[in-house]
Amino acid sequence: MPAKKKVAAVVKVAPQAGQATPAPPVGMALGPHGVNIMEFCKAYNAQTEGQRGNIVPVEITIYEDRTFSFVLKTPPAAELIKKAAGIKKGTENPATHKVGKISKDQVREIAETKMPDLNANDIEAAMKIVAGTARSMGVEVEV
C-alpha cells in the first residue's frame, strides 16, 4: 500500500459551474499554496459542465507535494430557492416583505438535491431545513 500524502491545506471555493478561471476567487484561494491553477480549472469545468448556471461549491485538498484532489458539493440552498421562486435575491426584511412563493413539491425537490450535504436523517427533516432557509430569504412556502 502506498504511503499517504500529507495534507497541506483544505480550501473551499464556490465558482460558477463550468466557468472557473484563474481569476479571483479561484486564483486567490489556490495561488498561495503553489497549486497549478489552470489544471484545477480544467478539471473542475469538465466535471461541472452539465450544471452550468449553478454555483457549485468545491472542497479542494492540497497536498505537500502541490498536488490536489477535490470534492464537489451541491449548489447552495439559497441559490436553488431563488431559481425555483424566480427571483434575483432575497429580501432584507423577511418578516414583513415577501418576495416570492415556492410550493411544497419544489421544497421537496430542493431537499432531495441537497440531501447529501445536509445533516438530516430523512427527507422530511431536509425539507424543514430548506423551508427555513426560504423563510429567512422572504420566500413564502406553500403548505
UniProtKB/Swiss-Prot annotation:
Keyword annotations for this protein? Methylation, Ribonucleoprotein, Ribosomal protein, RNA-binding, rRNA-binding
Q: Does the keyword Membrane apply?
A: no
Q: Which GO terms describe its biological process?
A: translation
Changes after translation: One or more lysine residues are methylated.
Highest taxon above the source species: Bacteria
Coiled-coil spans are none
Q: Which Gene3D superfamilies match?
A: Ribosomal protein L11, C-terminal domain, Ribosomal protein L11/L12, N-terminal domain
Q: Does the keyword Cytoplasm apply?
A: no
Q: Which GO terms describe its cellular component?
A: cytosolic large ribosomal subunit
- Family statement: Belongs to the universal ribosomal protein uL11 family.
Q: How does it assemble?
A: Part of the ribosomal stalk of the 50S ribosomal subunit. Interacts with L10 and the large rRNA to form the base of the stalk. L10 forms an elongated spine to which L12 dimers bind in a sequential fashion forming a multimeric L10(L12)X complex.
**What does the record give as the function of this protein?**
Forms part of the ribosomal stalk which helps the ribosome interact with GTP-bound translation factors.
Check the record and name the PANTHER family matching this protein: 60S RIBOSOMAL PROTEIN L12, LARGE RIBOSOMAL SUBUNIT PROTEIN UL11M
Q: Could you identify this protein by its name? A: Large ribosomal subunit protein uL11
Q: Whose protein is this, by species? A: Cutibacterium acnes (strain DSM 16379 / KPA171202) (Propionibacterium acnes)
